């Protein structure tokens, strides 16, 4: 699939602010600083589409981007940043949960984890949440340029074991810097969304 057009539509907090045209949605979620904005910009070929923040925990809203005028890519707030109050953390959690609850157009959720580290308790909880709400989960290990090829196997084993993924699960590794395998990843993530239209 070619991403021919991508445009920012709205930043939302409340359900009534979400787009209501019933186009399919794919949501991206992950810890603060996992490289979410970078991967969105990389996959859509738009450098500044999602704002890359130098301050972790900056994305507090749900951002909707319309791709090819066919479907929405939804950027959910980053979670797990230590330097915010419990109240603020709870607020982000509520924002994400509100979106996941009975969101008809949502077809799949992409969970991003940093391939250099063991998934955190927050990552595990997010994975469980997504499954609990009945959505397809795609796990992508980001920042793969930061580890060597022989560390990939170890990283894959650790991520699968920690999240409880099946042994035959096809975990995807991606680097927004070298963009290796980008076209295949775009097809893997977005093709079936368009088939449904």
UniProtKB/Swiss-Prot annotation:
The keyword ATP-binding does not apply. Pfam families: MMR_HSR1. GTP binds at residues 30-37, 57-61, 75-78, 142-145, 174-176. Keywords: Cell cycle, Cell division, GTP-binding, Magnesium, Metal-binding, Nucleotide-binding, Septation. PROSITE patterns: G_ENGB. It comes from the Bacteria. CDD domains: YihA_EngB. GO terms for biological process: division septum assembly. Residues 22-195 form the EngB-type G domain. Belongs to the TRAFAC class TrmE-Era-EngA-EngB-Septin-like GTPase superfamily. EngB GTPase family. This is Probable GTP-binding protein EngB. It comes from Clostridium perfringens (strain SM101 / Type A). The lineage of its organism: Bacteria, Bacillati, Bacillota, Clostridia, Eubacteriales.
